[in-house]
């Protein structure tokens, strides 16, 4: 989907379908998102923003619904840099799908999840939401430590498996807002998938 905007900045999203809420692979998928684009030490942030200065922002995130989920990579950049940025992003996606992640990357992602959850739970409204969502969506409540144990149980092999399953370039969807007049003009900026 393309929405035209006369500004020279473009917002682009690359989307992949994932599993629904409550699926056993959810923790591995969330850790994959953290490693690929969830922090300032993530692969995409380092390669696309820090090393090459191609975008203002780049990140990966997961949203889970009852029966399906989305794994989305978002980038905001100058339209003149789109082709080069997409080359780098697609290369990193293919690399993580083909070769998985390292033990060090997984350990850092688990630390990020642990730190983020513990920080969130210091706020009483966030704490209420944490427990309320579980009660509403799963009809059971898992405490923070047990929730973190689910993330701790994820292995390098688990992340490699979900990366290979989810990050299929042929099944990727693209959405963008930018100065392109038509989808063909936009798609010419993407590497051959």
What are these regions (language model features)?
Residues 154-164:
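A short, acidic, amphipathic alpha-helical segment used as a generic capping/interface helix at domain edges
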Residues 30, 159, 174:
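Short, conserved catalytic/metal-binding micro-motifs enriched in Asp/Glu and His
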Residues 1-43, 150, 180:
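His/Glu-based metal-binding/catalytic segments typifying zinc-dependent metallopeptidases
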Residues 24-27, 124-125, 185-188:
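Short conserved micro-motifs at the rims of enzyme active sites and ligand-binding pockets
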